[in-house]
Amino acid sequence: MLCIAVFAIIPQKECTPERMEADFRANHQKIEMLIRITRSWLPDSTGFSVEYSKHGKLTDWGVSSKQEVNFQGVEIGSQKEQEKELRKIGLSLERLDSVRLALQKMDYRGLSINKGGAISDYTEIVYGKTGNKEFNYRIYDKPLADSLVYKLNRCYNLIVYNRYVVFSCVEDFDYDSLFPGKYAYLQKHTLSK
């Protein structure tokens, strides 16, 4: 008996500041539309996050709301129960699926709408993961002040792209890990201005 095994290696998305900038420029209108539509579904004081695997399987979701929503991790029971809980915050399985499809078309993994942040409300888009690092776009509702831009750029894991968008790199066990390629990227952009 002959047994042949074939292994396919799926390349990881390149998570460099230059690649993130290029992807953001290519998708910024789609990102803004996704954020605007998703926020229109949610009550004012409700934050929401959802994350999918590379293959589109729901891996995590969460809600911060005054409304009590019963969810236990990814699985919250039957489809009827899921629909009932999601409707409490203006969502449905169909709406979650449309978020998944929009993220998948842009090759992104997740969305997190944060309300009542220390700086301002913002939305995070999970750009990609490499090893134990997660790379995100943080898109603020209000422009960042000069002093805040300076402070954020001094953080090892953040790069201020513009007054509304910050690139972040979060490592599972070390929140102060260096964003790979950060200083070369900032130096290049400082010289080009």
List each language-model region with its residue ranges.
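N-terminal Sec-pathway targeting helices
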Residues: 1-3
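Extracytoplasmic electrostatic interaction patches
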Residues: 87-193
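N-terminal export/targeting and maturation segments
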Residues: 5-94
